[in-house]
Amino acid sequence: MNLIRRVSAIYKEQELPEYRGNPLIEALPEALTEDEVLLEMSYFPEIDEKIRWTAPANVREQYVERIKKFRCPQTNLIQAYKMILRALRESYAARNPLKSGTIQYLHYYGNERPDIEPESGYFKSQAETITIVGMSGSGKTTMIEQVMDHFPQIIEHSSYKGVFPGFSKQIVWVKINCPYNSSVRDLCEEILQKLDDAIGIERTTPEIRNGALARQIAQRIKSSFLG
């Protein structure tokens, strides 16, 4: 989870009309069937019979450690995959970078909007939130990491249908850990740092005042098309 996976955009025609013509959605991996989810996100370490029966005890002891990498997805992983995929697509559906409403949304600070309504209408967020609750150690983080690893973290765009789409990098996701001291300020600075690292730019100097820092982060999230 520490390495940032970057890919070049490969656009795929979408079946749903609300997703068509949107480079942010067309560049995402194709939706998997339930069987494909289970197959891709499972891992069963191969058993070497020679090591199992004839290797020295110390080697067999190390070999058993491979069981820690064993992954046998359950049905809740399928549901998590569907929820995350839907959240990504719905969020991007409202932010088609080729529409005038999105261009207005990107260029105005915070929730400001022009007096004249864009041709495609004012921007309306369709962002979703997902809550996963479970006992400590039940595998929530591992499950989410498995699902997120299916998606590239950065998609680089250069040409969409023969023209420059107006942006070059799309941050699909970032993982933020809550600070140990529960500081809102530290959390905000961590978000800003993660976005800088994902884009590949020098660390941005955080604003001193919390309100200004929040607006700084919001603007960075906008411009990077965070999923």
Question: What is each residue range found by the language model?
Answer:
Residues 136:
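The conserved Walker
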Residues 143, 147, 187:
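Hydrophobic positions on the alpha1 helix immediately C-terminal to the Walker A/P-loop
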Residues 155-179:
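Conserved catalytic segments around the Walker B and adjacent sensor/switch elements
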Residues 150-162, 197-200:
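Post-Walker A helix-loop "phosphate-sensing" segment adjacent to the P-loop in P-loop NTPases
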